[in-house]
């Protein structure tokens, strides 16, 4: 559908692009629930407008994406360990290789679907992604080969689409907290699926597991209906309808003079009060930013050296996140002594750190943007990048002092938690920088950055395959220092 522009009332929305300016509370409003002059309910509690629908759908989808993405890995690992189907060394090796296959598919998918979303819109891209993910996921269950394990990673493109959706719907002043909440909830899905799979595998008859294994794909498939029929690509409506409208009027310089466009109204009324109408003549030409695509502009994105700096930062940061999940018992020096249920609880606990760290990092980034504009966001990235590297260095030095697997376990766990929390603060600041780099190719930019994050997970796991934990962590910390220097030189 095409939304009437009378819905984008100041001060709740950016009058130039229809993007929402708040999520949890309207700015400069005394009321927590609604804005006094327009009576607009805060987006987090509303489903009326496309912004709120996109946010709530993105929350549901991103957690389902991560649950489904890590479902087969966690299912096979827990089942093999619980029933002692294989030796521990074989289980660990198989888990590591399966994880790397998944991240390879994730790297490709994130870049491709960022590009596709810029061309055909988020809704249709998401529907295609879900269909392919279900197809490859079920095929992987039935046939189980390396190619299908890689293709199973295609579902990771949903991270890009969900983040891109809220970036398209919400204004730059709150992108840190909105994308931070989204990323935090999504990564928490990893812990959730490990808990669910362990609980059910340890509770139900082994013969029934063959039916249980399909449930995430069925649930994911059901989301196609609300995505396609109950949501919009951008604040103005659906990509295809807007593209058609734009093409019909491409040669008209002032689109406000068109008299026969039924669903567009440039004048905003609030309770029959026209006090805001002069302040809210929306520049409809800005719709072009949401629906235009150019191959030449797309490839020009990669000439931006600042994009490389952010890509390396996300490679380092999200690479740490994925590496911790895969190697936590090794880092804690308890790989051979810890029980399966405690391993699952550790994964759950570390995934839960995302719920706190990412939104806080995003909120701090937004506040600095409010005070210092884009330079404020960049400085916060550098601060959290340096703190994460420092935490990693302290952890590295502490690990060197350990003499046995059970010595100083609590201190080691605390240091890893601090390292992970600082890293989550960093991740909460990164995505909010993307619209400042190229607002007309956000899918390509976000897809590129997110792909580097998956590459970080691949490299981190390869490093832990060939080096001991101390040396592996040292390599990661050195890369963190190099990344900090590159960011300081390029971004400031």
Question: What kind of region is each of these model predictions?
Answer:
Residues 56-84, 88, 193-194, 322-329:
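Extracytoplasmic
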